[in-house]
């Protein structure tokens, strides 16, 4: 386990493949000579105005609000069919293997809401996840601060990976999958805590003039939510974020659904968190394990890609709209996620004679 962490956090990311999550910007000034200079130069070829416009275009593309044409939507569904409709096929693929569950939180277990501090999951969903964790090893993998997402879920028997996988902690109690006397804690970006706190404070100050903008400190990353910002103010918001980030060459900007994410440039993401957790559970390099990862965000693509590249398990994208994805299947909304999880529990219980 220690070897796995060392191999993945001691190297800065390659400039051509920082993450499967789209990188909008890497911090630093034009004269910076760090390993990220080439990426920064590429982003600044068109100078400020062009850069901001490209950000805004990417912000729109990452947060679709309406379906594409009927034909394109239909083609997408054929390529990424409903996990509910293909449930028997999924069970067939997992036959004879240990299923391990990985779940995003926002937009997957809870609905997307205007106020991120009120993204509560329903009691019914919590009960479903509780039953799921009795049947399979289960982890919550979120961009949120680990303590925050844990306070939302309120289940001590789960593994939690917060800050896009940069803050991982094993079950406190109640998990039959936790190794005896195992105290699991992985925080590969600890050295970045002071700079993230500093950037968070500056972002709060710089975005105060933009109505609806909300900055969240997620411990090892900072999030700028723009769900409640009028679209004609997005360029102003992007400008303010860039004005802060340009002074921090070891940070990068990625994005999700109506959110900009400021993260350390280290070789760690939700995909690495998935691999770390599988190793912690004793399933590294195993052929008899079947990870299922369910998520709705672009940051989940790192995990989807790991599973696709390894031809191991499968990814399920939660989305009503066609999106480019490495996931194999789709579900439209958290309610469908709950139905899928309930069916998994029922199937497992029937196999165990429960």
Swiss-Prot record:
This is Probable trehalose-phosphate phosphatase E. GO terms for molecular function: trehalose-phosphatase activity. It comes from Arabidopsis thaliana (Mouse-ear cress). Pfam families: Trehalose_PPase. Its EC number is 3.1.3.12. Signal peptide: none annotated. The lineage of its organism: Eukaryota, Viridiplantae, Streptophyta, Embryophyta, Tracheophyta. The gene is TPPE. It comes from the Eukaryota. Belongs to the trehalose phosphatase family. GO terms for biological process: trehalose biosynthetic process. It catalyses: alpha,alpha-trehalose 6-phosphate + H2O = alpha,alpha-trehalose + phosphate.
């Amino acid at each position: 386990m220690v070897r796995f962490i060392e191999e993945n956090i001691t190297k800065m990311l390659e400039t051509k493949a920082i993450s499967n999550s789209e990188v909008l910007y890497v911090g630093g000034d034009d004269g910076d000579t760090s390993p990220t200079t080439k990426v920064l130069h590429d982003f600044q070829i068109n100078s400020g105005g062009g850069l901001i416009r490209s950000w805004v275009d990417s912000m729109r593309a990452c947060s679709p609000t309406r379906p594409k044409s009927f034909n394109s939507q239909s083609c997408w569904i054929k390529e990424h069919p409903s996990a509910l409709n293909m449930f028997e096929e999924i069970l067939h693929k997992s036959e004879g293997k240990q299923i391990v569950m990985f779940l995003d939180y926002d937009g997957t277990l809870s609905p997307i809401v205007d106020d991120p501090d009120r993204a509560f999951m329903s009691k019914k969903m919590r009960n479903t996840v509780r039953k799921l964790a009795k049947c399979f090893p289960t982890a919550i993998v979120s961009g949120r601060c680990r303590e925050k997402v844990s306070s939302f879920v309120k289940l001590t028997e789960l593994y939690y990976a917060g800050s896009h996988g940069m803050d991982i902690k094993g079950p406190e109690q109640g998990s039959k999958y936790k190794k005896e006397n195992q105290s699991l804690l992985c925080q590969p970006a600890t050295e970045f805590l002071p700079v993230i706190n500093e950037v968070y404070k500056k972002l709060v100050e710089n975005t105060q003039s933009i109505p609806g903008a909300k900055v969240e400190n997620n411990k090892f990353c900072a999030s700028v939510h723009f769900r409640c910002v009028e679209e004609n103010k997005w360029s102003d918001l992007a400008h303010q974020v860039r004005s802060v980030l340009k002074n921090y060459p070891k940070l990068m900007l990625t994005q999700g659904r109506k959110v900009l994410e400021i993260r350390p440039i280290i070789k760690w993401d939700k995909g690495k968190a998935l691999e770390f957790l599988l190793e912690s559970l004793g399933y590294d390099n195993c052929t008899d394990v079947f990870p299922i990862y369910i998520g709705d965000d672009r940051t989940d693509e790192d995990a989807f890609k790991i599973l696709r590249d390894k031809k191991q398990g499968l990814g399920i994208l939660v989305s009503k709209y066609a999106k480019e994805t490495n996931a194999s299947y789709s579900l439209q909304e958290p309610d469908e996620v709950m139905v899928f999880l309930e069916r998994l529990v029922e199937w497992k219980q029937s196999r165990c004679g429960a």
